[in-house]
Structure formats: C-alpha cells, structure tokens
Amino acid sequence: SIFKDLYEQKNFRGMKRDAMRAACIWIACWKHGCPRTSNEIADIFHIDKNSASLGCSSAEELLQSHERTMEQQDKSKLCSLKPSTFIERFSSRLELTVEQQLLAKFIAHQVEKKELIPDNRPQAIAAGILYFVSFYCKLPYSKMDIKLKLGDEASEVTINKCFKKLNEYKTLLLPSWVHSKYGASGSSSSGGKNNRKK
C-alpha cells in the first residue's frame, strides 16, 4: 500500500504518521474522482498545512515512481483538477443561493472551455470566481472573507488577480439576468469598491 511504502521510505521517516495517513487519503480521493486539496486534507486530519502539503507531494512522487515502468493503461488514473471541481463545496461555505451557485458553475465552465485564466491553480481560480459572483450579486464578502472561508486556498492578491482577469470578460461571463436583478454595472475593475469591507 501507499501508506506502507511511505512509512518504509527513509526520505519520509521524518513525516508524522497522521501526515502519511492523510496523504494516502488524498491519493484515494483523486483516484476515485473526488479530489481534495492538501489544505482540505489538513483540516480533515487536524494537522498543519505544511505537513499535509509535504505528505501529499511525497505520496504523489512515490506513486509516480512505482508506476514508472507500468504500461500507460495500467497506471493510476487521477482525475483532472478544474475550477468547477471546487465550486459546489466552496459555495456551501459561503451559503450561496442555488441560483448563485449555478452562476458560479456557469462561469467556471466558461473559464475552462475558453482557457481564460491559464496561469493560476484551479482552486485559486474558483476562489476568484466566487469573489466575482459575490461582487456582482452584491454579497457582503470581501477578498479576505473569501480567503478565510475557503481555508486559505488562495491569497487576497491571487483572488484579486483572478477577479481582474474575470472582469475583462464580464460581458461573456455575466448573463443579462444578473444585471437586471442586481444592477451589476461593473464600474470597478479591481473589485475594491461596491460598499464592501476590505
């Protein structure tokens, strides 16, 4: 098993047992189509984020090492990670309405389809999308609120960068009903105004 192999690897003997167990669960989640970030795994196992990140990276390296000589069809198939992967469960932390969740999913799919933000991690893009939705749906969440509620999956700076990029495509990403319902004008390109706290 991955856990046994991790435990026996000299390079990983400084790793805590909980981090090794967490890493194995992380791999299992990816293999079964329900990926979790190392930060989410850290929260589940109540371990520090650095230990979780180290454990997950080590487990991934070990898996790749073990499967290097295998035929492609026999290798573990880890599901792909996309912004839409995170939207539903990230949305639940913000208590978005069903309508707002569907809007966030629509935006995520558009971003993926057209590769609008190629330079950021999927979870960071998801955080940016949720701030974008929050901003245009007049929700009381600042970038710091999003950062904290999503467990530090993205920094305020990264969320703002993603927001700015999304804002460049707001005519593509925002259906007309958003403007009708919320009066979304998009007058602020940085997302720093709109009567929300910072």
Task: Describe the residue ranges of each PLM region.
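A cyclin-like helical interaction fold
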Residues: 1-22, 26-119, 144, 150, ...
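Amphipathic, charged-and-aliphatic alpha-helical interface segments
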Residues: 19-27, 124-133
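Extended serine/threonine-enriched, polar tracts that run as long, contiguous segments within proteins
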Residues: 137-138
